[in-house]
A protein has these predicted regions:
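Repeat-blade elements of multi-bladed beta-propeller folds
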Residues: 9-18, 41-63, 84-109, 122-148, ...
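Short loop/turn segments that connect beta-strands within beta-propeller blades
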Residues: 68-72, 112-116, 151-154, 191-195, ...
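A short helix->beta-strand "capping" segment at the edge of beta-propeller domains
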Residues: 19-43
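Well-ordered, non-transmembrane segments within structured domains
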Residues: 62-65, 71-86
Length: 352
């Protein structure tokens, strides 16, 4: 049974800054079993591991709350920070803050998770759906194409810049720079002061999935095209084509890239030469993120099947079938939490 606390503001959690630093989880080798399943009252847009035994849930109606993995009674505090839906959020594990955006309310909130209080709230006309945290600067896109650089401590405006073209992606890239993707295939690198560093034009569909590490930006689109970009110089290193749409966010692990296609295939690729190391063929669409856990990859098939693969050779370690299609998934220290199409949230525990 879920118990909803009477307090209407803030999150029900007790964490320190050290708790928010996620170390590498144990390898999920063992026998998977369901520890518990509960029915959520609203459909979640976000399910994310937060710290200790807490997971963060943000629903489409605009509720924000946490759940405790270890408790048989799921004690929850419902919090409605806005009158309307939440469009985007950022968890800053370096400061213990949660940033929430409502484009329908045109508002942005900074919440201190350590002291359980609101730091500041700012009204931003025409606020869009893209945000990024670059060092201590919060980047916010307006629907007008203007990017605002805000001081993350107080919400004050530091810089602003008008971007030509429709922005379809925005993210922090190492080291403390901003990546901007536009619908015309433009890829841009900016400093946290919104000064341009480099610009690259590539042939890629709008709204690609992308990821980055200290050296590279990897982008993939709905035609199966993959672009590997040097994130310091903004140069295209090489490109690949897997001839099937890619909707699932990519996984980088050292010099290896792991990706999944809409046809249910998972590939391991060597980024030194672009060669395919292995292929695993499953059944059905993959549109959830590939999750890395030391030497393994967790793959969620939309129809309800989870598969754990070895990163070195793609061999299957175990699989688990749920009764309904999977909508959300997040790794936790001893397993995985999933939400299905019936709004059922389940903790699949994997112990040696």
């Amino acid at each position: 049974m879920m118990i909803f606390a009477s307090c209407s503001k803030g999150l029900h959690l007790k964490v320190t800054l050290e708790d928010l630093v996620i170390s590498e989880y144990p390898v999920l080798i063992g026998e998977p079993h369901i520890a518990w399943t509960r029915k959520l009252s609203s459909t979640p847009r976000t399910v994310e591991y937060l710290a200790k035994s807490y997971i963060l849930i943000i629903t489409y109606p605009g509720e924000v709350f946490t759940m405790d993995l270890t408790s048989s009674e799921k004690k929850v505090r419902r919090w409605h920070p806005f009158r309307k839906r939440i469009k985007n959020h950022i968890v800053d594990r370096n400061s213990g803050r949660l940033y929430l955006v409502s484009s329908m309310d045109d508002k942005l909130i900074a919440y201190d998770m350590l002291n359980k209080k609101q730091l500041w709230k700012r009204k931003i006309p025409h606020i869009g759906s893209h945000t990024a945290l670059v060092e201590n600067t919060l980047m916010v896109l307006q629907k007008t194409g203007n990017i605002m650089a805000l001081d993350s401590d107080n919400g004050e405006l530091l810089e602003s810049k008008k971007i030509n073209g429709q922005v379809t992606g925005m993210a922090h890239i190492p080291i403390d720079n901003l990546l901007i993707i536009t619908a015309d295939g433009g890829v841009h690198g900016y400093t946290n002061k919104l000064k341009p560093i480099w610009k690259l034009a590539i042939n890629i569909n709008p709204n690609p999935v992308y990821t980055a590490n200290d050296d590279r930006i990897i982008m993939a689109d709905s035609n199966g095209r993959i672009k590997i970009i040097d994130n310091k110089q903004g140069e295209l290193q090489f490109e690949l084509d897997v001839h099937n749409p890619i909707y699932a966010p990519l996984l980088l692990s050292g010099e290896r890239l792991f990706l999944a296609t809409s046809a249910g295939e998972v590939l391991g690729i060597d980024l030194m030469d672009g060669k395919v190391l292995w292929r695993y063929q499953g059944s059905g669409l993959i549109n959830q993120p590939l999750l890395g856990n030391k030497s393994t990859i967790l793959v969620a098939y939309a129809r309800g099947k989870l598969v754990l693969l070895n990163q070195d050779d793609g061999s299957e370690q175990w699989s688990y079938k749920f009764d309904h299609p999977l909508e959300r998934i997040t790794l936790v220290p001893q397993g995985v939490v999933v939400v299905d199409s019936e709004r059922q949230i389940s903790y699949l525990q994997v112990l040696p």
